[in-house]
Amino acid sequence: MTNQTVSPLFPHRHLLGIKGLSPLDILCLLDLADQEIAVSRQPEKKKSVLRGRTQINLFFEASTRTQSSFELAGKRLGADVMNMSVGNSSVKKGETLIDTAMTLNAMQPDILVIRHASAGAAALLAQKVGCSVVNAGDGAHEHPTQALLDALTIRRAKGQIENLIVAICGDVLHSRVARSNILLLNALGARVRVVAPSTLLPAGMADMSVEVFNSMEEGLKDADVVMMLRLQRERMAGSFVPSVREYFHFYGLDREKLKFAKPDALVMHPGPMNRGVEIASDVADGPQSVIQQQVEMGVAVRMAVMEALLDPRRNPGNGEPA
């Protein structure tokens, strides 16, 4: 990625995943997000680039930080933002995703942000509506804006991503965050490791250009970044780990395990955290943690994504789906 010129133009209509984005597309979004940070840090947190545009947030899975982040991002760009409460909607009365999509499409929104438990839901929605679609997480498939905000956090702390050793640890099997991060970090030249018990590793990891470890000591050795994943017990139908106590003993990030990584290694977590399950509180709140910075970068990245998709100066013709 060294010495390549990054275009300010983003040639896609949707953001459905990291897969389908080129390294230069990713850098375009990260560079724009760098600019958006200043907006969020000024007293008047507002710009009018999307004034008159309408954003609908359609969350079929519970979310606090992601939905709030998308809402703030849209409002700071000047868009009109509507949060659809699925719990009180026609979906609960038997309406299908397609029916809901067609109804919302008739209202002429400019962008739909969707989170859904089914992999491929965002892509299906994009085929049925006339506006841009952003995937805010679809099952265990992808979570592109999380990977982008993680990359932005790493780049701002370390100055680069290329050649860094990034260890992604924990429940990789059920994690859309892990999948999107692996795709993005590989695209930008990082050395990616996954660290997990064999029961929490998906099939086909060898095809994703990662090093696989079942030991935290081996997996964290000389790591520049340690990215912990939440143990997603709500997605587990069987017995994937013997007990929470045993899981933390072997795979929870505490001070002793963190010593295996480089002394200046970053500690990351996409949230929400299970303290005492995958990460100890003194590590989550410690000097190497950039978890709160990830939250701040989330708003900037989502601002960048929506501006890149909807601002005609950055997306003439609203491009092709990614």
Swiss-Prot record:
Sorted UniProt keywords: Pyrimidine biosynthesis, Transferase
Entry-linked Gene3D superfamilies: Aspartate/ornithine carbamoyltransferase (3.40.50.1370)
Catalyses which reaction(s): carbamoyl phosphate + L-aspartate = N-carbamoyl-L-aspartate + phosphate + H(+)
Function: Catalyzes the condensation of carbamoyl phosphate and aspartate to form carbamoyl aspartate and inorganic phosphate, the committed step in the de novo pyrimidine nucleotide biosynthesis pathway.
Binding residues annotated for carbamoyl phosphate, in chain numbering: 65-66, 115, 143, 146, 271-272
Membership in a protein family: Belongs to the aspartate/ornithine carbamoyltransferase superfamily. ATCase family.
Binding of L-aspartate, residues: 93, 176, 230
MF annotations from Gene Ontology: amino acid binding; aspartate carbamoyltransferase activity
Keyword Transferase: yes
Domain of life, per lineage: Bacteria
E.C. designation(s): 2.1.3.2
Gene expressing this chain: pyrB
PROSITE patterns reported in the protein's UniProt record: CARBAMOYLTRANSFERASE
Subunit structure and binding partners: Heterododecamer (2C3:3R2) of six catalytic PyrB chains organized as two trimers (C3), and six regulatory PyrI chains organized as three dimers (R2).
Protein name: Aspartate carbamoyltransferase catalytic subunit
A Pfam family hit: OTCace
Recorded metabolic or biological pathway in which this protein acts: Pyrimidine metabolism; UMP biosynthesis via de novo pathway; (S)-dihydroorotate from bicarbonate: step 2/3
GO CC annotation terms, alphabetical: cytosol
Species: Brucella abortus (strain 2308)
Keyword hit for Transferase: yes
One of the protein's GO biological processes: 'de novo' pyrimidine nucleobase biosynthetic process
InterPro entries assigned: Asp/Orn_carbamoyltranf_P-bd (IPR006132), Asp/Orn_carbamoylTrfase (IPR006130), Asp/Orn_carbamoylTrfase_sf (IPR036901), Asp_carbamoyltransf (IPR002082), Asp_carbamoyltransf_Asp/Orn-bd (IPR006131)
